[in-house]
Each structure stands twice: as C-alpha cells, then as structure tokens.
C-alpha cells in the first residue's frame, strides 16, 4: 500500500503557522514513508472560496519546500458527492429534516432543562407524509442528516456506541456516537458541508492516513461511521496538538502577524518556520534543520504532546540567525544578486558578514558600508581623532593579504601604545560607523587601501 496523505484547507484566506504545521506533518510523514502528498482545496463554499487564495496557499507551500504530487478542487467534484448522497439515501442512512434554526435552538434549550445532552432528537424520522407535505407546501426545503449507527433497533432510542481508533499521535481514542447529533451533510440549498466531500474524497483519492489538528478528534467518530456506511474501511487518523499565540489565543486566518506571507515578508527563512512549526510542542529539541529531509529525521508523530503548544515568534528569529550564520554562499548567491550584491567580492563579503545577520536582507546595510563607507559619521574625542590620524599614517601599503589587519594593528600599537578596546573601538567606528559587527580582519581586505584611507576622520 502506498502511503497517501492530504492537506485540505479552505481557500478563504492566507494560511498561518498552524496550517503550515499540519501541512508539514503530512509532508514529512509522506517523506518518511515514500508516500504521496495530495493538496486538496475544500472549496465547496463557493461564496467565500477564491482561486487567488488557493494560488497563494500553493505559493506558501512551495516556499516551505512542499510540492504536492497532485492538486484537487472539491468544487469540481460535485457529481461524485451527488452519487454518494444517492447511495446513502438508498441505504436509509440519510434523512430529510425540515426544522428551522430557531426551532432547533429551542429544542436544544428544552433538552438542557430536562438534563439531556443538547443533541438532535431525530424528530424528523417521526414525521408523517402529511407533515412533510405541509412543510413543502410552506416552501420549506429539507436539509439532510446522516443517521449515526448508535442504536440497536429503534433510532429514536440511541444507546452508547463507542468508536475506537489508534491515533498516530494520541494513541487509543474513543468517541461515543450517542453523545453526538446526526451531522448535517447537505444544506437546504443543496450545498455540502465539510464532512461528506471530505470522506468521499479520502475514499476516491486513496488517502491512507489523515493527519490534522486535534480539534477534529470528535469529528473522527462521525467520519469513521460514514466511511463504513459507504462501504470502505477508514484510513489511519492522527491528531496533532494545536498551536496558540504566546498569550494562549487560538490561531486563525485573521491572525495576520503569523501568516506565512507575513513571516516571509519579515525576512524569516522557510526552514526557520518549518523547524519551529514542526518541533514545538514535541519531545524533540527545537533546532534549525537545514532542509525538510533533515527535519524529517527528527519527525515522529507519536512524539507530539497532547497539550497545545505556544508559538513564540521570538524563537523564529533565534532559528533564523542560526540559519544565516551557517548559510553557504551557493545558497545565498542568487538572493544576494537580487539585492545588488554581486561580483568578485560577493562571496568573501558574505562569509564575512553572515555571522552578524538576523535576516539575509540585512546584508545590504553592510554592503553599503563596504562600498560607500559609514552611513553615519561618528563623533570622536580629540584624543581618539589624534589616535586615528596616527593609525592611518601606518596603514600598510598594498598588495594586502589575509594578515593585513594583524599587521596594521601591530604597527598602530607600536606607534601609539594603545591596545584592547582603546585601540579597536575607534578603528571600528571609523571604518564602519558602528560599535559592533563582522570581524575587521575580514572586512579590511575587502575595503582595500584606498577605501580604507577614505574613512579617515
């Protein structure tokens, strides 16, 4: 059997870090099992779903390193769902209901006052032909519910019916179908809710493993029953913990600051996002992986905590710095070129400055300093100005080699008697305009003698 997973968001907005966690869990699981990854858009809500969001989601996934084996749209598969509806009706497990939302709300309140669970009481099953005709004459159109198999003889007398499955993440799980309402599969206007298309597509597309957030645990009992009603054994399920903000709030597509788009625009590397999204809330230490293949080696669904995990954006910047500090020039070259950093000096420049970068785009500032000199001229005391005058007088002649910084500072020490911070800080300020930064031993050869002398205060 080929392992087949799917990531199935609704294209009603940009995806956030929590959505990315689900996509990455599926991708890494497929990677570890030589399986297939299907990108499926649950776009049956025609009014809210937009192709531009679907395209944006695919762009975000590609940026993360996820390249689906197939892309499917539920909005193009209504005939398949219609056929499944007819099968369920023929089997007597999909029934018409005519209650209005107000009537359903009133019934829930009545059940609560009687100490009963606020689930649907299947009153529609007891409707007479006359009552149905009257509803239809009044212009009411039915919605359709799936009859859960939680009874022995009389569906109006549900009894405890446990559905069990071994969850990839959570271990043994149980849902009592008697505690649930029969789910509405088809609305009054004939459109589909999430449940039926999802199950039908999982069957039709050969999905072997469904990995998603643990807010779907209760849904799983219903879906297992629906799989069986359609004559198919259910897939293996895995429900990972959800990410929250640092303050404990749930993430949503309106959590703009944590959208993949905003993180990308903020200069965060895709592997910083992927590493934190996958490893936070697991027994693994959070560390920056170089690529998804390396990250897959640290991925085990069973190592995921059952408790929600807080996603701290500050941790992203820590991981981002690690990735910057170790990024080979070959990986950075094309992106640096877009920023205007190219030529013979590009590689030694990158190797000199990468250890001081939070984001790759920060290299632009150091490139300007290298090419143009300090962007803000520092102020010096009279003593430091005199010291710098002497220092620039003993600047070695070219050609320079890798020891020029050591040679120069040795001469400065002999000429001025200064050492330590008193020697190095005025030089750093004169050469770069900043009190800290890359090793001057690496920058000085890139400045050249003429460029260095031009920085003399």
Curated annotation (Swiss-Prot):
Name by which UniProt lists this protein: Glutamate--tRNA ligase 2
What is the role of the protein in this entry? Catalyzes the attachment of glutamate to tRNA(Glu) in a two-step reaction: glutamate is first activated by ATP to form Glu-AMP and then transferred to the acceptor end of tRNA(Glu).
Catalyzed reactions per annotation: tRNA(Glu) + L-glutamate + ATP = L-glutamyl-tRNA(Glu) + AMP + diphosphate
Q: Which gene encodes it?
A: gltX2
Superkingdom as given in the UniProt entry: Bacteria
* Location of the motif 'KMSKS' region: 250-254
The UniProt entry, under CDD domains, shows:
GluRS_core
| Cross-referenced PROSITE patterns | AA_TRNA_LIGASE_I
| Binding sites annotated in the UniProt record for ATP | 253
Q: Which GO terms describe its cellular component?
A: cytoplasm
For biological process, the GO terms are: glutamyl-tRNA aminoacylation
Similarity annotation: Belongs to the class-I aminoacyl-tRNA synthetase family. Glutamate--tRNA ligase type 1 subfamily.
Enumerate the GO terms in the molecular function aspect: ATP binding; glutamate-tRNA ligase activity; tRNA binding; zinc ion binding
| Location(s) in or outside the cell | Cytoplasm
What's a Pfam family this protein contains?
Anticodon_2
Q: How does it assemble?
A: Monomer.
The Enzyme Commission number assigned here is 6.1.1.17
Name the principal localization, coarsely classed: cytoplasm
Report motif location: 'HIGH' region: 9-19
What PANTHER family does this protein's entry cite? GLUTAMATE--TRNA LIGASE (PTHR43311), GLUTAMATE--TRNA LIGASE, MITOCHONDRIAL-RELATED (PTHR43311:SF2)
Q: Which organism is it from?
A: Mesorhizobium japonicum (strain LMG 29417 / CECT 9101 / MAFF 303099) (Mesorhizobium loti (strain MAFF 303099))
> Could you tell me the keywords of this UniProt record?
Aminoacyl-tRNA synthetase, ATP-binding, Cytoplasm, Ligase, Nucleotide-binding, Protein biosynthesis
Q: Does the keyword DNA-binding apply?
A: no
